[in-house]
């Protein structure tokens, strides 16, 4: 894997070790030793005060990987082995938690309360524009002439930062809050971050933004593995972006998944073909009825945004199901008694799956890589597995920005020339503001708007396995090999 930060290495390593213990039937018996083995005595503890703090962080980071969250802890003395036993019991008799994400309070470093700080670059100038312009009189001057900020009075308005002619005042971001486009993350009175589920759109931007790796998804890995071990039929439906995830042939990737124990593998691109045809017909129908524009509906993060933050956009969102929706029904039709597992790069698919009775579990590409490592499955040695059904190139193109738009236009052929299509390929604050304006005015720069939460599309999803640039390049190469088209 092309790790771009150490927090990815930590997640991968921890889940790999947990899967290894599970595979050896030692999860409950040996999990209590895992934090000690990962941070042995006298080991370096990067970013933590001591080895004991590091071990505590390993312990609590194990909870979401076991399918639990911080609310499940009622007694700090409860050992990991007890949580592991609960996780296995849930996998046998219960269902995954409804929570999608959680903040590991023990790992959260409680970043700065105030975002501005005056550095020693302050020249102690006569103008003192920082002090004069501060609306809360929070800027004071030392006897030396240098300015300083009273953090109890400061409201982080940034006026002093803009006023300083020497750029001596720096802005210190809180990375997770900075990454969140809908202000769903905020600190409590102790400085620990919390995710407001009523605002969160599950875009996953915070997941890799936190430099301490304190934000986790609630995993369903052990629920899936338990079903496979029991001998149940478990079918994997894999997102189109898998073409850009692993540096092996796609047949080897599917072969490795078969080796994990999946009954069958179905490409979500099959479902994308249904999405394309249905969405194309719906678009033409709505435009003929006089509707000014229609947006896509396949990105679950965008659907959450509309439901929670831009309800005025609802009439303009396509009613067509996502590729996962249709692929899950293809799987259920072929294997009525099977558990269906969607595998992709997306956090928000976990929320979509809660509303879809045909999808039982979600796994990410990142989790798949850890599972393969924990089970000691070498992808390059896996027996290649080929699909019996091949989807058109455009269906696989859903993985990249412009892919949905391009597929619909390709399907419509000559009719597409009359349609002006545009794309929104990153749900940041600016894009959300634009979408809100479209909904309010009922006017948009195009008649068909493709919306994806991730910059560049699903190929850059928060739970991707490959490095972004390499993944895009690999996807482009794989798409070029697929000759079938509309």
Model-assigned labels for residue ranges:
Residues 1-73, 217-486:
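Iron-sulfur-associated redox domains of electron-transfer enzymes in respiratory
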Residues 1-163, 167-174, 451, 478-482, ...:
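Ferredoxin-type iron-sulfur electron-transfer modules and their immediate structural context
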Residues 111-117, 140-145, 187, 205, ...:
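Gly-rich Lys/Arg/Thr-decorated short loops/hinges at beta-loop-alpha junctions or inter-strand turns
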Residues 118, 150, 196, 238-239, ...:
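A secondary-structure boundary/capping signal
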Residues 122, 152, 198, 245-246, ...:
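Residues that cap or flank secondary-structure elements
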Residues 127-151, 159-196, 201, 205-220, ...:
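Iron-sulfur cluster-binding cysteine motifs and their immediate structural context
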Residues 156, 202, 323:
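Short, glycine/acidic-rich beta->alpha junctions
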């Amino acid at each position: 894997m092309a790790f771009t930060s150490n927090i990815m290495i930590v997640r991968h390593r921890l889940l790999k070790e947990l899967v290894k213990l599970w595979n050896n039937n030692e999860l409950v018996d040996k999990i209590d030793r895992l934090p000690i083995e990962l941070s042995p005595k006298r080991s370096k503890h990067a970013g933590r005060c001591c080895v004991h703090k590091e071990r505590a962080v390993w312990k609590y980071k194990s909870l979401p990987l076991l399918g639990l969250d911080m609310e499940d802890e009622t007694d700090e003395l409860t050992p990991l082995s007890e949580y592991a036993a609960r996780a296995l019991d849930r996998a046998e008799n219960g269902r995954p938690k409804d929570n999608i994400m959680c903040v590991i309070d023990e790992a959260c470093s409680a970043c700065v309360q105030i975002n501005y700080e005056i550095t020693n670059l302050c020249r102690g100038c006569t103008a003192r524009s920082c002090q004069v312009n501060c609306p809360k009189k929070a800027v004071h001057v030392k006897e030396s002439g240098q300015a300083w900020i009273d953090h109890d009075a400061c409201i982080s308005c940034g006026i002093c930062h803009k006023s300083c002619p020497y750029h001596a005042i720096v802005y210190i971001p809180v990375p997770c809050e900075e990454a969140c486009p809908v202000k769903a993350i905020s600190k409590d009175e102790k400085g620990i971050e919390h995710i407001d589920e009523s605002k969160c759109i599950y875009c996953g931007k915070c997941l890799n933004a936190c430099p301490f790796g304190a934000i986790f998804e609630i995993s369903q890995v052990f629920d899936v593995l338990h079903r496979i071990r029991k001998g149940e039929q478990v079918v994997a439906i894999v997102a189109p972006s898998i073409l850009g995830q692993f540096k092996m042939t796609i047949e080897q990737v599917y072969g490795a998944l078969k080796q994990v124990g999946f009954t069958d593998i179905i490409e979500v691109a099959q479902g994308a073909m249904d999405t394309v045809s249905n969405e194309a017909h719906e678009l033409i129908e709505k435009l003929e009825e006089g509707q000014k524009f229609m947006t896509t509906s396949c990105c679950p993060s965008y659907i959450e945004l509309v439901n929670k933050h831009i309800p005025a956009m609802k009439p303009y969102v396509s009613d067509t199901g996502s590729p996962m929706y249709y692929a899950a029904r293809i799987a259920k039709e072929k294997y009525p008694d099977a558990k269906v597992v969607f595998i992709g790069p997306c956090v928000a698919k976990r929320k979509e799956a809660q509303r879809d009775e045909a999808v039982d579990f979600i796994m990410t590409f990142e989790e798949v890589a850890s599972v393969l490592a924990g089970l000691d499955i070498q992808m390059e040695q896996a027996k290649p597995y080929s699909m019996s059904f091949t989807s058109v190139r455009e269906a696989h193109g859903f993985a990249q920005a412009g892919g949905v738009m391009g597929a619909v236009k390709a399907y419509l052929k000559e009719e597409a020339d009359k349609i002006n299509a545009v794309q929104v390929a990153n749900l940041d604050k600016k894009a959300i503001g634009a979408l809100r304006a479209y909904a309010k005015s009922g006017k948009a720069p195009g008649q068909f708007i493709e919306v994806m939460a991730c910059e560049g599309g699903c190929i850059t999803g928060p739970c991707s396995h490959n490095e972004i640039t390499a993944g895009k390049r690999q996807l482009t190469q794989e798409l070029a090999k697929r000759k079938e088209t509309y």
